[in-house]
Amino acid sequence: MNEYNRARIRLLTNQEAIDFVSAINSDGTATRYALENFDRTYRVNARSLLGVLYFTTEHNEDTYLVNDDGGSIPTSIDKFRV
């Protein structure tokens, strides 16, 4: 498995999911971000609103933002960190 960074987040409302996706997509990079559950068995593209909305309905208690490219987690999502 590639080395990557991971941060626990919480998205409780649809508006928070929309704001989160907007923040991730405004970082100006092509970095691959994903949301995954605690044991890494379920993943979605964090840049996809549909994926994020679905993921938060199924796995909201244990949601992690992952940088698959080994870089840092953008500071624009700090307000969603747990």
Where do the protein language model's features map onto the residues?
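Short glycine-/aliphatic-rich beta-strand segments at the starts of folded cytosolic domains
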Residues: 2-11
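RNA-recognition motif
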Residues: 38
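Amphipathic alpha-helical interaction surfaces in cytosolic regulatory modules
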Residues: 15-33, 41-61, 73-81
